[in-house]
Amino acid sequence: MDFYRALSDYYDEIFPLKGPQKTFLQDYIRRESLTSVLDIGCGTGTFAIETSNTGVRVLGVDLSEEMVEISNKKAKKIGSTASFSLADMRDLSRINEEFDGVFCLGNTLAHVSGDIELKEVLTQFGKKGTHLLLQTVNYDRILAKQVKELPMIKTAHLTFYRHYTFRPDGLLDFNMKIEFMDSREVVSGTNLLYPIKVDRLKKTLLETGWEVSGQWGNFDKDAWTEESPATVLAARRIPR
């Protein structure tokens, strides 16, 4: 079984929507009065579909054909108004619409190649919306503590393992493995990640026309510290 096909098939089992995520999104949409959202790196559409349930018009995009296919099937099954299509966050030129908000959640942003591409991507985001919500792993903690392994995720059907390999060029190899309980089959894959520290992210946001309006360490809205599991940032486009 191909790793990324397996990951897309079991993504919702591995990463189910949790109460704090749902509440955070609802509060954010209400506070910023969003009526439309572009969800970049939407995965299997979990956040996009939840956002559409609030009455917001949502387009979810992802680089994975499998993820987009699953998202469309989920939306159709439950009658969601969310729509989905293929797109790479590095090139949003085919998306002609503008939105109130842009979401880039689930550590999608860390797939840029470095500072230059980060700046290019955040600049593109500013052409698509006036409000921005970002979420990544807290790489300040990962780098400071040289964290090499994230907690494994165990479900009724599988165990999901995640390890980091620190590279000399400052990037991370993110090594993932899924072990299926019944068949004992194991599939694995590796992604190259740019570990974006929070100061770098905030500096680049400012350089690309964004003003940070909120920062948290998780979707429970706990204050961000170097020990936080995640970095969640909200920003507003600075009027020109």
Task: Label the predicted regions.
Residues 117-131:
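A short glycine-rich, Lys/Arg-flanked "PGG" loop and its adjoining helix->strand segment in the class I
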Residues 133-204:
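SAM-dependent methyltransferase
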Residues 100-116:
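A short SAM/SAH-binding and catalytic strip from SAM-dependent methyltransferases
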Residues 1-32, 34-43:
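Conserved class I S-adenosyl-L-methionine
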Residues 91-97:
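Short conserved loop adjoining the S-adenosyl-L-methionine
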